[in-house]
Amino acid sequence: MGKGTIDALNVPLKDRVTQIELAMERLRWLPVFNSGPYIIVNIPAYQLWAFDDIDQNNANITTMKVVVGKALDHQTPVLMAEMRFIDFNPYWNVPYNIFKKELLPKLQQNPGYLEKENMELVATFGNDSKSVTFNSSAIEALKQGNLRIRQRPGKQNALGRIKFMFPNKDDVYLHDTPSRSLFAKTRRDLSHGCVRVADPQRLAEFALKDQWTKDEIQAALNVPKTQRVILKKSIPVLFFYTTAFFDPNNDLVLYSDIYGNDAILIEALKNSEDLSDQAIFVSNNIAS
C-alpha cells in the first residue's frame, strides 16, 4: 500500500462530504448539454471521456489517460470551446515564454541546439514559412520577437503526431506526445498547460468517424507532412475541474485537489459575490 493510498484513507469523512458538495456546486455552473458528441476532460482525474452522444445512457464512450498542466506554474484552465480542426504531423510553434525560460539558456550554451532538436527559425508561424539561417544576430532577433522557433514534424516533435484544435483565449489544445512513459505515472500534472492524450489515434477516429476511415487516418499519420482536416461539424470540448465525479459505471471516484481549487471555492462560497473564476467560465470561455 503506497503513501498516496494511506493518505486518502486518512481523509476525514466530513472532508469527503465537502468534496461532494463542491462537486455539486460546480455541476450547477455548467450549461445545459445538447445531444451529440462531447469531449470532456476532468483535470484532477487526469482523464478524458469522449461521448458519441452525451444524452444517451447507452452511448459509446471513449476514455483515455491525459497529462495536464503543472500545478505550480502551468495550470490547465477550465474552459468550454468547439473543436474545429485536427492537424496531423503538426509543427510545434514554440511560445515566447517557453523560448525565454527554457530554450534561450540552451541556445546560448549550444548554438547547435536547434538542429539537435529538429527545430528551425522562422519570421512568422505558418506551415508555408521559410526557414531562416541561424547566425550571431539570431538570438537578439528572437529576444525582440522578430524571429520565432518552431519544431518540425517528426518523432521528436513535442506535440507528437496529432493536434486537436478548439480556439480559446488560453491557447491550449489536446495533442499527442513523444513522452509516452508519463502516462504510467499516478500524478500527471506535467505539461505547460495543454492536455496530452494517451491514445491520439483513437481520439482522431472518434472526432472523424463521420469523415474518415481508420485507414485514411493511418495514412495521414504515415505521411511526414502536415495535413489539416476541418471537421464537418464542430465538437464541444469541456475542461472541467472537480475532485468528486462519477465514472462511466456510475461509481463515485474522489481525486486529489492538485491545484488547490477546493480550498479556494470553500472560501469563495462564504461570500456568494466572490466565487472562484470557475463559476463564470461558461460566459468567459465559450469560443465563438
Task: Report residues per predicted region.
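Well-ordered beta-sheet/strand-loop patches within structured domains
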Residues: 3-288
